[in-house]
Every structure is written in C-alpha cells, then in structure tokens.
C-alpha cells in the first residue's frame, strides 16, 4: 500500500501530546522520540511581557496577557517560558514552527529576545494568523522564515499580494479549505502548503488528494 505521508512533513501539533500536555517539554521530547519532522508550538506574552509557550489566549475569559506567569503556572503547571525551552531543548537540530498568538507587541519582544540571546534561527519558522506579526518580523529581519496561518480562502490576486510583500515560506490552511487551484498556485511560487489539524486518520482519503507539503497532526503515524 502506498504511504500516504511519504512526501509530507509530519508536524507535531504542540508537540506529541498523546501522553503529555500540550506545549509541554515532555511533549516536545516525545515528538523527537517518535520522529516527527517538525514541532509546532504556540507563543504569547504574559502581563509582564514574558514570552510563554501556551496556546489559549484566555483562561475562563480572562486574557492571558493580563495575567502573570506565576498565576498561569498555578493552573497550568507545565507552562514553559520560551527562555527555559531554549535552555532545556536542543532547538538547533529540530525544525520548529512557532505559532504567534495574542497582541501585536509580541513580535517586537520576540525579535529583541532572539537578538539579545543570539538564538540560532536556522531551523525556525514564525507564523501567525495576524499579518501585523508577519509585517513586523519581515521588517525586523528579512532572514526570518515566515508562515501565514489562515481560516480564509483568499482569491489568487490577494494571495499574490501577500506573498509578493512578505517572505512567506508556507501557508497553513484549515484542512477544509484545501483546493487544487490554491495549492498549485503556491507551488508555482515555491511556497509550501500545510494543513491543520489532523485529529482522525479518516481525514486522510480527502487530504491525500492534494499535493501538500505538511500536516500539523495530533496523531502519530508511520
């Protein structure tokens, strides 16, 4: 039987979370152990502008950006600071896809952090739903590899405007939006197409029809 995943990057959604909580150090280690090609992780700010690895932008309708890291840790003890992640994880040998969450100021603080600590960004991609994030990073350092995450199906002229302006390496679509015209257009411009999030292998017969480059997945597969 043909391997449906042969040419697709396996992207561990918030790490491999079958046995550990989302965005935890243990989930990131498991993604390596189970040989995922890339790890997707979410980052945002607390109220003191610490960069945390965390997905949800509110906790019981209180915005995370109004809470301290200590408050968040009391409810979610596995929450990591980005600084701790870089100290404890061999990020130079793993492809990382950062999903930027929250307000616009995240990118300024992130850029300053990467410069201050001389972080090797060779295996890093920075992506967001928020074009303000992409715009800032593009101007701060043209060498940043950027991605657009979207629930929108743009017309080709709008997508052309976006990829002409920004150094977009991939576009990650919600899986229901896949269509041949957009995938072919992106490939013709040397831009990868990713989809999110594979939660059930029953989706594969549909996804495999498209010549995409990567799947953000909760599921381990061979």
Predicted regions and their residues:
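Phosphate-group recognition and catalysis centered on beta-loop-alpha active-site segments
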Residues: 1-222
């Amino acid at each position: 039987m043909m391997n449906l995943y042969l040419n697709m990057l396996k992207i561990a959604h918030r790490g491999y979370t079958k046995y550990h909580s989302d965005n935890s150090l243990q989930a990131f280690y498991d993604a390596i152990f189970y040989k995922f090609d890339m790890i997707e992780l979410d980052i945002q700010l607390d109220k003191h502008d610490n960069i945390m690895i965390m997905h949800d932008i509110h906790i019981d309708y209180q915005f995370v950006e109004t809470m301290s890291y200590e408050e968040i840790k009391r409810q979610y003890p596995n929450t990591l600071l980005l600084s701790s992640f870089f100290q404890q994880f061999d990020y130079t040998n793993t492809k990382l896809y950062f999903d930027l969450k929250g307000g616009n100021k995240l990118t300024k603080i992130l850029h300053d952090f990467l410069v201050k600590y001389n972080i090797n960004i060779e295996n890093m991609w920075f992506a967001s739903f928020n074009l303000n994030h992409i715009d800032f990073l593009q101007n701060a350092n043209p060498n940043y590899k950027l991605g657009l995450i979207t629930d929108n199906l743009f017309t080709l002229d709008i997508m052309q405007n976006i990829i002409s302006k920004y150094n977009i390496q991939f576009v990650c679509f919600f899986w229901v939006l896949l269509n041949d015209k957009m995938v072919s257009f992106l490939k013709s411009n040397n831009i990868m197409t990713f989809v999110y999030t594979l939660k059930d292998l029953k989706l594969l017969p549909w996804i495999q029809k498209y010549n995409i480059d990567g799947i953000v997945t909760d599921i381990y597969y061979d």
